Amino acid sequence: MAVNMKGKSFLSINDLTLEEMYQVFDLSRTLKEKLYTGEEHHLLKGKTLGMIFSKPSTRTRISFEVGIYQLGGIGMYFGPNDLQLN
């Protein structure tokens, strides 16, 4: 049975139940299959996502930006200086 995760936020894997984790894995498998077959999917169409990382990592930031773009969204990176966290 599908769990409604609309509006749910999580920062750690511990924030998800086992059932929610399985649902995330199932969705990721489906999206990966669609990517490889060239099937269009825009799960994040019309969405803007803010990315905040505690440590600078170009590879991680680029990976997230590419993933968000592939899903039809817009990613915005905010560094520590942008958010006045220092």
Please place each PLM-identified region on the residue numbering.
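Short beta-strand elements in bilobed, periplasmic/extracellular small-molecule ligand-binding domains
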Residues: G72-N86
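Positively charged, low-complexity intrinsically disordered leader regions
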Residues: M1-I62, V66
